[in-house]
């Protein structure tokens, strides 16, 4: 049985599940409008202070605040006027605006540089400690501090444990980690 906060997932309606789960895909999806309008897809009633806070956690506030219009900056369809990393950070911020109990990050930091990735993970830990986070990543540094790591290879689970345990017990994980550290 799959449980969310101790409750059988089947006891939730689809709408109530959508309210407690935030999903951030690898390919960021933005629509034409303003940054604020895109972020409010997470919670239509969110105020500007809440949007700013989510942007700060997601490491998006620095570039948003540097524009002359801030949260009211126009976004083109698909976010073509933004870099891949900026789009990913805004998509993460949008999920945070929704106050998820479960946050799924599906390789959604792949376009970020290592320093931004690290700071984003630090902020998620500091500001959202009570939120369960599932991070899917091909970057070992993005998940090495996770409580639990599940290693998949060719569609099969080949390892499970902490970073230190997997370095010893899982050749696939150890190879990935050592290759990426070179």
Language-model features: locations:
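C-terminal portion of ABC ATPase nucleotide-binding domains
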Residues: 66, 115, 122, 130, ...
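Conserved catalytic motifs of ABC-family nucleotide-binding domains
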Residues: 28-46, 82, 142-143
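ABC ATPase NBD Q-loop/coupling interface
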Residues: 1-16, 118
């Amino acid at each position: 049985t799959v449980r969310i906060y101790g409750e059988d997932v089947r006891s939730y309606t689809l709408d109530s599940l959508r309210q407690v789960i935030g999903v951030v895909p690898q390919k960021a999806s933005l629509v034409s409008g303003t940054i604020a309008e895109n972020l409010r897809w997470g919670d239509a009633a969110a105020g500007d202070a809440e949007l700013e806070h989510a942007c700060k956690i997601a490491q998006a506030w620095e570039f948003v605040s540097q524009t002359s219009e801030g949260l009211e900056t126009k976004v083109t369809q698909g976010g073509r006027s933004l870099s891949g990393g900026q789009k990913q950070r805004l998509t993460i911020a949008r999920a945070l605006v929704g106050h998820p109990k479960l946050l799924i990050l599906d390789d959604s930091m792949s376009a970020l540089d290592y320093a931004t990735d690290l700071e984003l993970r630090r902020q998620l830990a500091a500001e959202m400690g009570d939120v369960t986070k599932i991070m899917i990543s091909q970057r070992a540094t993005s998940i090495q501090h996770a409580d639990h790591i599940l290693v998949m290879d060719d569609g099969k689970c080949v390892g499970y444990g902490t970073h230190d345990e997997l370095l010893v017990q899982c050749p696939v994980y150890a190879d990935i980690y050592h290759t990426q550290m070179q």
